[in-house]
Amino acid sequence: MSNTLHRLPDQLRPNLRLVFVGTAASTRSAELGHYYAHPGNRFWRAIHEAGITPRRYQPGEFAALIELGIGFTDLSKTGAGMDHQIAAETIDVPGFRAKMEKYRPRTIAFTSKKTASLFYGMPSAAIALGRQARDGSWPEIFVLPSPSGAASGSWTLEPWRELAAWIKSRAD
């Protein structure tokens, strides 16, 4: 099966209040065509419990979040699987940067330290969770613990709550 079949559609438009960025679609997400679709993934519960969304959405409802000012993309639009299974050549940081410059979201949230490490070009161990130092004209950037069930040892909701508080403090 071609990796291009695994692509999830970007959910982007100008001036979103928040864009969630993953490394690549999980195998399950790629099969279903929905972000964070694996039953063990905590994403949908986390964004609700943290106060980012007014209710708990289901993976198949991801497109509805654009009406809340929330978008989605991945650094690899053609790879699928767990982070360690994603081929390096499918990671497109320049393409991601171009999308963010085009759409100018207010806040970017990487949904794992691995994703942030690929963006920043530094080891995951060197990246702290939470709000990152401001980088010039770039939007605010948060790094969240991976909601994947495979990353349960490092799970905490606190950075997600920090993100929710930040978003609410900047509401129009």
Where are these regions (language model features)?
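Internal catalytic-core helix/loop-beta-alpha segment
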Residues: 67-124
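Short, surface-exposed acidic-centric catalytic microdomains
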Residues: 28-88
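Short glycine-/acidic-enriched loop or helix-start segments at secondary-structure transitions
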Residues: 29-32, 118-121, 153-154
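Short, glycine/serine-rich, charged loops/turns that create anion-binding
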Residues: 25, 115, 148
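A residue-level structural signature of the nucleotidyltransferase/glycosyltransferase Rossmann-like core
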Residues: 18, 35, 107-108
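N-terminal nucleotide-binding beta1-loop-alpha1 segment
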Residues: 20-23
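Short amphipathic alpha-helices and their capping/turn segments at secondary-structure boundaries
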Residues: 6-13, 56-65, 99
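C-terminal capping/extension of enzyme domains
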Residues: 1-17, 38-39, 82-97, 123-172
